């Protein structure tokens, strides 16, 4: 009977995690963000709201949904899943801001790809919107907020903390 209960719960979690990722990939998630990105190529600049929406959906949903799905499959407490949802959004935004910084400040040798791609395509990004100093400050602020959320979980989040710091400190 206990194995049957576990099997049912495990199956429910797999379905819930799958739904989380599927929803994140759909029109209200990554696809929606990509549509905004494509449409933005016709505009000179994006508003701050459009830029955040695009990256929260395009990049952020990939990161957020992966973290939430992992928490679901790991049978985390519902309160922790809700906190990890917010953590994932903030981490996704920090990741994208850092990516925009690296596009301007990084080297081709370290990145393994061409830099200044957004500038070459005349695309809006966080650096063009806020400038380098503000973007660096935003990365640090979002990282601190992420760590604060992780400190508030009911489980040890050592590896997520390590990931968070690595994303801030990355050079590629």
What are these regions (language model features)?
Residues 1-172:
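All-alpha prenyltransferase/terpene-synthase fold signal
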């Amino acid at each position: 009977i206990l194995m049957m209960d576990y099997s049912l719960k495990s199956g429910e979690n797999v379905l819930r995690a799958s739904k989380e990722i599927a929803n994140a990939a759909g029109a209200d998630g990554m696809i929606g963000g990509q549509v905004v990105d494509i449409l933005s190529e016709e505009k000179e600049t994006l508003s701050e709201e459009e830029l955040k929406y695009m990256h929260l959906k395009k990049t952020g949903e990939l990161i957020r949904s992966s973290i939430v799905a992992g928490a679901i499959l790991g049978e985390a407490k519902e309160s922790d899943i809700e906190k990890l949802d917010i953590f994932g959004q903030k981490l996704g935004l920090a990741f994208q801001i850092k990516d925009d910084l690296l596009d301007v400040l990084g080297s081709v040798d370290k990145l393994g790809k061409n830099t200044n791609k957004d500038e070459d395509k005349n695309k809006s990004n966080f650096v063009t919107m806020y400038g380098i100093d503000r973007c660096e400050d935003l990365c640090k602020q979002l990282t601190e907020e992420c760590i604060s959320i992780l400190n508030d979980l009911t489980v040890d989040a050592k590896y997520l903390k390590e990931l968070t710091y690595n994303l801030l400190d990355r050079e590629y």
